[in-house]
């Protein structure tokens, strides 16, 4: 079983992660593609970044500086799970994983990225902001989806071949998972859905659902899950499996609001 997560917009101010002696940070396998994208992004102005990603002027200026220094600042790279600091990563809580869970996560948890394509948790990355839905024109097309094409799906296929994984658990957002070309992907996909019930209405509450996606990835890693049916035992954040709302491809987890 593989699991995929979205990255986080919010980055840790002081990223830190204690690793066991036999587990070292790794390098992104699609680093050459990230370098190519960074060269394109380096030519963008703060106004361009504001328009493309709808971000503030200070954040745009910060990322202009980051892309300008991207190829000279590799020493600033840190493990992805230490740098990402959003709700999903609050649910994952990589800093509190034991050594065995971290080792398993390094092999089986994948992080989708607009800049790096596909990451392992301990892959060293640099601070950046480049969302997958960004309409950044490259020689491959008008968007990052065009740039990545089937490369992310093929990288997932390669990970599955290396690990023997037979299914992919999609804990990413629609924006990011769209980058995994389903026509090229050789794995069946299971997409857990996290709903909140309040006043008789069931809906996705973004804050809790993002945390639950991270917690689901942690649950998979800690228990070294391979059988999709074992996902049903997930209990975190008040969520519990709801069989009446679920299908094999879309297990639903419900919490009271």
Curated annotation (Swiss-Prot):
Gene Ontology BP annotations: response to hydroperoxide
Recorded superkingdom: Bacteria
Annotated Pfam families: H2O2_YaaD
Entry GO CC: cytosol
Family under the similarity heading: Belongs to the UPF0246 family.
Record HAMAP family: UPF0246
Name of the protein this chain belongs to: UPF0246 protein RHOS4_29700
Organism of derivation: Cereibacter sphaeroides (strain ATCC 17023 / DSM 158 / JCM 6121 / CCUG 31486 / LMG 2827 / NBRC 12203 / NCIMB 8253 / ATH 2.4.1.)
Taxonomic path: Bacteria, Pseudomonadati, Pseudomonadota, Alphaproteobacteria, Rhodobacterales
